[in-house]
């Protein structure tokens, strides 16, 4: 477990939603765990993790929360803010974990979409998470602002958006939407474009 708050430079470097994220080989995961009691929710924990050699950050979080001995009679909501979306294998493990813990719901807001050499695997992993009930979204200014004020040692400095934050969020949101679209809708769109001569 890393210290509770991230350094400003580390957060800005790793979470910046730039198109070409050279040199960013680590994945950071900021999390909030809440227990839902009827109409209210109670925060149980928050913090951040980063991948360690040989273990992706998503699996580190699953190990961490598995040690909690969660009450199966209560509902829990976990929210992740990640610098990269999960790889295929991590998505598979997370979906399986949720299947065995139906009282736990997960939302993931990611800064960037991760694609390995096999560009078909990661999108399938995201679809698998979506089918498992995970809400997946791209981080927007509001999410960065929340993270800055919750997870970053900000020394009372206000979060300032970098050039391109909004445009890159919109571009990535469109890309994620295309990935999560049911395949028949994608085929319908392709047919429509063919009919229009595109």
From Swiss-Prot:
GO BP of this protein: cellular response to lipopolysaccharide; cytidine deamination; defense response to bacterium; isotype switching; mRNA processing; positive regulation of gene expression via chromosomal CpG island demethylation; regulation of nuclear cell cycle DNA replication; somatic hypermutation of immunoglobulin genes
S-S bridge residues: none
Effect of residue 143 to A: 10-fold decrease in MCM3AP-binding affinity, loss of relocalization to the nucleus in the presence of MCM3AP, decreased deamination activity to about 33% of the wild-type protein
Names of required cofactors: Zn(2+)
Keywords, ordered alphabetically: Cytoplasm, Hydrolase, Metal-binding, mRNA processing, Nucleus, Phosphoprotein, Ubl conjugation, Zinc
Active site (catalytic residues): 58
Chain positions with Phosphoserine modification: 38
Gene Ontology MF terms in the entry: cytidine deaminase activity; identical protein binding; ubiquitin protein ligase binding; zinc ion binding
Enzyme Commission code(s) on record: 3.5.4.38
Pfam families: APOBEC_N
Effect of residue 15 to L: Severely decreased cytidine deaminase activity. Loss of mutagenic activity
Function: Single-stranded DNA-specific cytidine deaminase. Involved in somatic hypermutation (SHM), gene conversion, and class-switch recombination (CSR) in B-lymphocytes by deaminating C to U during transcription of Ig-variable (V) and Ig-switch (S) region DNA. Required for several crucial steps of B-cell terminal differentiation necessary for efficient antibody responses. May also play a role in the epigenetic regulation of gene expression by participating in DNA demethylation.
Protein name: Single-stranded DNA cytosine deaminase
Organism: Mus musculus (Mouse)
Gene that this polypeptide is encoded by: Aicda
């Amino acid at each position: 477990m890393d210290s509770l708050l991230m350094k400003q430079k580390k957060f800005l470097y790793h979470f910046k939603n730039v198109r070409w994220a050279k040199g960013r080989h680590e994945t950071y995961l900021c999390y909030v765990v809440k227990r839902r009691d009827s109409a209210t929710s109670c925060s149980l924990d928050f913090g951040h993790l980063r991948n360690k050699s040989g273990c992706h950050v998503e699996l580190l979080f699953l190990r961490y929360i598995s040690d909690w001995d969660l009450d199966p009679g209560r509902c829990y909501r976990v929210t992740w803010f990640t610098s990269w979306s999960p790889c295929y294998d991590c998505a598979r493990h997370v979906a399986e974990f949720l299947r065995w813990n139906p009282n736990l719901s997960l939302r993931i807001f990611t800064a960037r979409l991760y694609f390995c050499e096999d560009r078909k695997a990661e999108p399938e992993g995201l679809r698998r998470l979506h089918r498992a009930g995970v809400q997946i979204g791209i981080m927007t200014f509001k999410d960065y602002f929340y993270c800055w004020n919750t997870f970053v040692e900000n020394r009372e400095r206000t979060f300032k958006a970098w050039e391109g934050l909004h445009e890159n969020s919109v571009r990535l949101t469109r890309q994620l939407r295309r990935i999560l679209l049911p395949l028949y809708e994608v085929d319908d769109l392709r047919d429509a474009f063919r009919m229009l001569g595109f």
